[in-house]
Amino acid sequence: MLFNIEKNLKSLEDSVVAYEQEPIEKGKILFYGHSLFTRWGSPKYGYRRMDEDIRMKDGSLAVVNHGFGTSTSEELLYYYPRLVRPWEPRALVIATLANDGMYGYDMMQSMQNLVKILHWARTDFPGIKLFVVEDHPRPSLITSVPQKWNGALHKSNEYRQLLQAYAQLHPDTKIIELWNQPELFETPEDVGDYTKVRKDIFVEDKVHPNQAGYDILGPIFRKALDELL
């Protein structure tokens, strides 16, 4: 329940302030979410920038990246007025869920926070295109404890089903599918066997992609956003 959640919603305030100090680029595709986005071009990690990987077809800039750390769905909701609204995006790409479980949020709380963000966005920006990113398969989910692994798989399946149900009711919302992308598995035939997610495209923590991982994600996101590029 919510009264058991003790996440400090301002623990990532420094990251938010840093984005606020950058020039506001209105009318772009705004990426908003957790560390899958944060590391995509962060100087700290030395990866190629997201705005280099995802560009307009004429080569001009297309995206603004507002990924921040271990953010939860509630933090994304909390910071929406500061990190989304001033940029007046024409499309919003949001990634959440991955950190919610370890801070005590259940699936419906995560989904409710996400739905509020999407509702606010379409209220603030009529005609905006909305994209929700599936949680991505990763080697860290594979453990020697069957109960833990089965629980993680069940949670991801439940979340994906909720996303698909939501998207069916809202034509302005599309799901960017990652869970069954062949490029993330050892062979295309391994899709669906989550013990065979490629390990070579992740850093040592087995959670976050390395540059080879982002080399795969770039085309996936470009394809999903093609009509806007």
Language-model regions: role of each:
Residues 30-33, 62-67, 91-95, 130-134, ...:
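Structural recognition of the beta-strand scaffold that forms the well-ordered cores
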Residues 43, 103-109, 143-144:
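Metal-dependent catalytic neighborhoods of phosphoester/phosphodiester hydrolases
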Residues 124-129:
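A short helix->loop->beta-strand "cap" motif at the edges of active sites that frequently abuts
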